[in-house]
Amino acid sequence: MNISNIKIMLLGSGELGKEFIIAAQRLGIHTIVVDRYKNAPAMQVAHESYVIDMLNSDALEQLILAKNPTYIVPEIEAINTDSLVKLEAHNFNIIPCAKAAKLTMDRQGIRALAAQQLNLQTSKFAFANSEQEYLDVIQSIGLPFVIKPVMSSSGKGQSIVKEHNEIKKAWDYAQNGSRGHAKGVIVEQFIDFDYEITLLTVRHKDGTSFCDPIGHIQKDGDYRFSWQPHTMPDTALAKSQEIAKEITDALGGYGVFGVELFIKGDEVFFNEVSPRPHDTGMVTLISQNINEFELHLRAIVGLPIPDIQTLQPSASAAILLEGDTANASICGIDKALADANVDIRIFGKKEIHGKRRMGVVLAKAQNTHIALETSKQALAHIHLTK
């Protein structure tokens, strides 16, 4: 295989994309990245970068036709997936495939596949496209419930509603967090689960491989901490792998899929799936012999996927900072790195207006509890320059 002739175009240039591009660069692959704003994280390490509205079909198709990449790799949901379907029909290689990109761009498509076609166990749910429909479905779902925009990312617009006086506020919050013109929401029965995991699932030319389960803590619908491995009963792990394989086989294509699952005893509930590396999987930058970004790249281009190993218990902590500046300066990294078991990735985002994830702390230890505490201690040192 001559990988030096491969040309990868990444649609979206965030922090996950940056690590993916670094993995490609290390193997001598030509990289092109695209996003809606200049100097996005992945643009800082790619050979070429372009700024376009990826929801604009003409702009997206013109750029792809002009650059003629070997592989087109979506990193975000805010892409015109109808264009991807069209381009795939003209023999462009969409990762993992246009069907997966289109189905997972909104929660309605993927939930219909999981619950209705595959009969996977999920929470009780309903969709609503207006405030009145929302009020109606609440009657059947009951309190407490979770509301999420049909189209959103990074937890935007998600909330848990426990009291009647929170119902209106949650609807408004979902509308403000919705992406594009979509106003629909999914209302889900709240499952009092024991824990939630991400099961990184790798579809490749030789079959399907799994990483050890990743435990994580979410706040306001967004990842804050993750750790690997998450200890769980063999029965629940086997069921989790079965569900992950079933949903990823239905989506098809090659690459890493982040399968989110709720676990209650030996019961496993499907939550969501993303056809790309997962933010909770950033812990694999320190925990595994091959991290999730390298796995994604290998699966895409057809390189071998050997035995995936967790080298040591590890944890990650999102560096979520708050401020209002166009030139963010981060302090405390020296103190955080004083611990030999800590590493840090700063994403290279300059602007921050409100709260923004600016980096990640990585820590390793003899067990995940200590690794998590170590990551939190290092995180406490990091702040914006005043």
Curated annotation (Swiss-Prot):
Keywords: ATP-binding, Ligase, Magnesium, Metal-binding, Nucleotide-binding, Purine biosynthesis. Disulfide bonds: none annotated. Residues 112-301 form the ATP-grasp domain. Mg(2+) binds at residues 260, 272. Pathway: Purine metabolism; IMP biosynthesis via de novo pathway; N(2)-formyl-N(1)-(5-phospho-D-ribosyl)glycinamide from N(1)-(5-phospho-D-ribosyl)glycinamide (formate route): step 1/1. ATP binds at residues 107, 148, 153-158, 188-191, 196. N(1)-(5-phospho-beta-D-ribosyl)glycinamide binds at residues 15-16, 75, 279, 349, 356-357. It is an enzyme of class 6 (ligase). InterPro entries: ATP-grasp, ATP-grasp_carboxylate-amine, ATP_grasp_subdomain_1, PreATP-grasp_dom_sf, PurT, PurT/PurK_preATP-grasp, PurT_C, Rudment_hybrid_motif. It catalyses: N(1)-(5-phospho-beta-D-ribosyl)glycinamide + formate + ATP = N(2)-formyl-N(1)-(5-phospho-beta-D-ribosyl)glycinamide + ADP + phosphate + H(+). It comes from the Bacteria. GO terms for biological process: 'de novo' IMP biosynthetic process. PROSITE patterns: ATP_GRASP. GO terms for molecular function: ATP binding; magnesium ion binding; phosphoribosylglycinamide formyltransferase 2 activity; phosphoribosylglycinamide formyltransferase activity. GO terms for cellular component: cytosol. Its EC number is 6.3.1.21. Involved in the de novo purine biosynthesis. Catalyzes the transfer of formate to 5-phospho-ribosyl-glycinamide (GAR), producing 5-phospho-ribosyl-N-formylglycinamide (FGAR). Formate is provided by PurU via hydrolysis of 10-formyl-tetrahydrofolate. Belongs to the PurK/PurT family. Homodimer. This is Formate-dependent phosphoribosylglycinamide formyltransferase. It comes from Francisella tularensis subsp. tularensis (strain SCHU S4 / Schu 4). The lineage of its organism: Bacteria, Pseudomonadati, Pseudomonadota, Gammaproteobacteria, Thiotrichales. The gene is purT.
